[in-house]
Amino acid sequence: MITDPGPAPPAAAGDPAAAAAAVHVSGLRKHYGDVVALAGVDLAIGAGEFFTLLGPSGSGKTTLLRLIAGFERPDAGRIELGGGDVTRTPPYARNVNTVFQDYALFPHMTVGQNIEYGLRVRRVPKAERREKVDRALEMVRLPGLGNRKPAQLSGGQRQRVALARAIVNEPQVLLLDEPLGALDLKLRQEMQLELLRVQREVGITFIYVTHDQEEALTMSDRIAVLNHGSIEQIGGPVEVYEWPRTPFVAGFIGVSNLIERDGHTITVRPEKLALIKDGEPEPPDAHVEPGQVRDVIYAGVLTRYVVDLDAGGELVVSRQNAEPASVATGSRVRVSWRPGQAFTIPQGPDQGSRAGEGKQ
C-alpha cells in the first residue's frame, strides 16, 4: 500500500505552549488595494525562539515582519509583544530591532559609532556604551575593528556590524529581513552558522524572513511556511520537510515527488527512492513502480534520474555519486520505496493546482 503515512511527525521544537510567547498575532489582515497580503494570520512565537517566515515572493512574509516591527498597520487583527498589545504602537516605542539586507549602516560613522548609535539616542552613559560595543564586537567576532569605516569592511563584516548594532540594544525581539541575500553562497552558509551561534548566546527571539529553504532548515527552531497571505504549515525543520501537510509545502521545501494513485496525492522525497535495474532483486516489502529513465542529471555530489512511470506520472530519484553512474537515459528500471517513506497529502479546495510551485 503506497499511502502508508509512516510514523507520526515529532512535536515541533520551541512550541510556545511550553514557553512564554514573545510575539502573538491573531486575525492579522493587510490589503494593498485589491491585493490580499495577509489573509487572517494567527501565530505565536516563543521567547528565545529562532522562528523563520519562509515563502516565495508575494507570500506575505515581509508584510508580516513589517507589521510586527510597526512600519505598517494592519487592516484588522492584533499584535502582542510580551503579552502587551502593540497593534497601534509606533515602531520606536516597540522593544524590537530590525536587520535589513542592505545593512543600513551610516557611512560617515565608524563601526563603533554605528553600533552605539541606539545607545546614544537612549542616553546610555559613555563608559557603559563602550563596554557594550566592545562586548557586541566580540560577540560577532570583529574585535578591534571599532575604528574602521563601513567602506573598509567586506560584505560579511558589514552584516556582522548590522547584527551587533541590533543586539547591543538588547531588544525583546530581533527581526531579520533576508539579511544574507546579498552575500555569496559560501559566505551565506558561514553566516547562517554565525547567526545561529549569536542567537543561542544572547537568547533573544529571532524572527527571520527568507525564501531560501536551506537557510530555514539550517537555523530555525520552527518554520512558518506562507503562501498567498496564509500560513500553510508551522513546524520544526524535520516536520515540515519529512511531513508536509499540503502539496504546496511538499513542493516548496526542497524537491518532492507528487504522484496520483487511487484518488490520492502521494509524496516521496527523491533521496528516499531506490533505482533497480533489470536483473536486480527488489527489496522485500517495498512498493515498486516500473518505468523508463528520461533524463540523467549530474549535480556534483549526486545524480538525479527522471523516470517516466508506466502507470503515469514521473519520479525523480537522487543517488549519491559514490561510484560512477550505471543507469543511462532510456534504460528500463524499477523505482522502489519502503513503507513509511511515502504518504498521502490531504487535498484542500485549491491545493492540487499548486502542488509543483516553488520547486528547486
Segments (PLM) and residue ranges:
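Non-catalytic connector elements of ABC transporters
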Residues: I2-G6, S256, T265-Q360
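ABC ATPase nucleotide-binding domain
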Residues: H24, A44, E80, R334-S336
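ABC ATPase nucleotide-binding domains
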Residues: F50, T89-R245
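The feature captures the beta-strand-to-loop junction immediately N-terminal to the Walker
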Residues: L54-P56
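ABC ATPase nucleotide-binding domain helices that frame the ATP-binding cleft
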Residues: T62-L65, V161
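Helix-to-loop junction immediately C-terminal to a conserved catalytic motif
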Residues: A69
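Conserved ABC transporter NBD signature motif
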Residues: G77-D85
